[in-house]
Amino acid sequence: MKLLRFADILLIYAEAANMAGSGPTQLAVDRLNSIIDRANEGTGTEPRATLAMTQAQFDQKVIDERSFELCFENDRYFDVLRKRLLQEVNLPDNADGYDENDYLLPIPALDALSIGQNPGYE
């Protein structure tokens, strides 16, 4: 059973609010900053999110914060796949690097009978 921590819910909200519009909303910034402030105990050592950030900058800030906040909770792998970041965060294991098939997971066998299997898992 997957348990969600409140910090994860706030990060999901901040990311969704940012991606649903054309950039971060005040509420999304506040949610992200509440996690940053709690983690740093208000020391001001971590740069906070602002409304001046572009959508891409805020998205990167959320992804970075997810990697800090949720480390060792097995979420990073799926964030990397979802955001298509394999090439940026991993050293290439081979000279060819990664292709689009590396971002796909296998479809369960019973479902694959009716809808087919993802490339690379046939």
Q: How should these model regions be labeled?
A:
Residues M1-E122:
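Acidic/polar-rich alpha-helix caps and helix-coil junctions
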